[in-house]
């Protein structure tokens, strides 16, 4: 499953690069487009949809997709694309440094180490409460950058990115599963729903922090979340 999930995201990334080239986007816009059109909100929104439609038992598939298909690729290939789009020099050392010093990656390794020790309950509760505020705070930060007068800025790029991410790629994946595996198994349905998630908040934050185009990143988040109410419903109904 891990290699399959990674393959799906890499295919999405390759397709977004081709579409971006067809649109003749400059390097800055192309990098932003690739990040937004590839990485989905597979945890915060994805887990909520999985829990609502298929139950908590199947969140584990979403978790595997989120870690290996979203998180690890975002902090590796995604960081490379962001620095490339901004025109910075890329090297194995600089990319490795960015990955290792990326706060979520640091916490990932600390968590692995912490599993060998008995953590006091109050610390666990505190970290859980702090963790639950991550996405809301990120959304507030994004919202503060959103200007209504610019809501339709770069709309031709934003709309193509959202359609590619939430409609075209999920349909291709769905048809592939239908041909090779069938779509009756719940893990297949969960995978398709994860693929169809709107653009990832953290990806947009990293894109903005890395100096990529704010308007494309922010407007794609807004349009993606709104569109997901309809697109995810249609996918779930078809898969039912």
Report each predicted region and the residues it spans.
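Alpha-helical transmembrane segments of multi-pass small-molecule/ion transporters
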Residues: 1-240
